[in-house]
């Protein structure tokens, strides 16, 4: 079928001072998980975002490395790059180590790969996103190797879709799940009222992640 190849804008990135020790990890009881050996070792996490700064001290050692660990459908960067910062932030929340300070990710011993879904202008077409999903199924294009990620994170959503279920990427997501890959989407920034999560996060196929603040109030 023929459909409009819509364009998606990159999420807004917030910048601040170096982070203090992360209260959220204690709320989620991450130290208890680490103490029994669940720190992400042996797990590969993929990020669909604005890219990743692979030189970041808390992420450099965790990059899996190689041609099967980075994909830029726009052809702008042959190696990991992030001209925005959003993808580096979300990756650090997941797998950041403690080298650069006191902050640390939820799974600091996991390794990462990434798709630079948005171009340097902060835009991604639907066709770019479909290509990204396809790459994640078989990063090196060789069915005889096992190099797909264990988890895919997508901290983006289709703006203006709160309360609507858009199925544009349902087949892509289902293909990942059928391959044994866990898929997580950010619920979006339209909360905290009911029925404000965005698509694809509000699709039943995915794990949808929201947020709370330090007082455990639901974030926007």
What are the roles of these predicted feature ranges?
Residues 21, 32-69, 74-128, 144-151, ...:
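Subtilisin-like serine protease catalytic core
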